[in-house]
């Protein structure tokens, strides 16, 4: 059977099939997982919460368990976590508007009141104390400081410049430096830069450990030599004391023998009188 054009249609042209659904990358769901689920076990974050040098959030109990069973050593993304020294305790500021099973974030920035996990804002973590602030808070407070500095006299410029290095936490006033700041859940170029920084840190720690291991044999050799020297000095002192005692004993025996011979002579002479 043909149509007007003289062509014979195939079955696939006559039967309509349902189109496959194309899965769209849901950025909001991914962000939710990063901010409120443990990066290792994917369970809900609950205190104590910890952070690594790449800005990943974990439940501390999951990290401890993974360290004990050795699963982190073969992990593709978290092999840099080698001990509890590789993580930092996070002290989030609680959000009073949060309720259980609600979509409101359980934490917020104590300065700007921005909820933690907002996709339009970055959050910074302080290694020294564990507090978390939005990047906007750092910018706003920095602008306030610069405005105050501009109002000061020129005579105080040196004091102002020297105080720039003395950074302190907005909550606990604990001092820190710029290297103590970690971006939580970074993305793009910042994440790649943090990976490079972490690799350099691990390489430097390996160099330091290798230097320490090279110095250990020398220390052992020195300690062995000192022990041998002390033992030899002890032996020589012991021999000297022994020789001195023997000489004293010989002198005392000689003196006693002379005294006995004199006494015997006196006894033999008395009967003749």
UniProtKB/Swiss-Prot annotation:
Family of the protein in this entry: Belongs to the rtf2 family.
Listed CDD domains: RING-like_Rtf2
Protein name listed in UniProt: Replication termination factor 2
Species per Swiss-Prot/TrEMBL record: Dictyostelium discoideum (Social amoeba)
Principal location class: nucleus
Composition-biased stretches (Polar residues): 225-244
Gene that encodes the chain: rtf2
Entry's localization field: Chromosome
Biased composition (Basic and acidic residues): 211-224
GO biological process, one term: mitotic DNA replication termination
Location of the region described as Disordered in the Swiss-Prot/TrEMBL record: 202-247
General function of this protein: Replication termination factor which is a component of the elongating replisome. Interacts with nascent DNA.
Transmembrane helix found in the keyword field: no
Cellular component aspect of the GO annotation: chromosome; nucleus
Keywords of the record: Chromosome
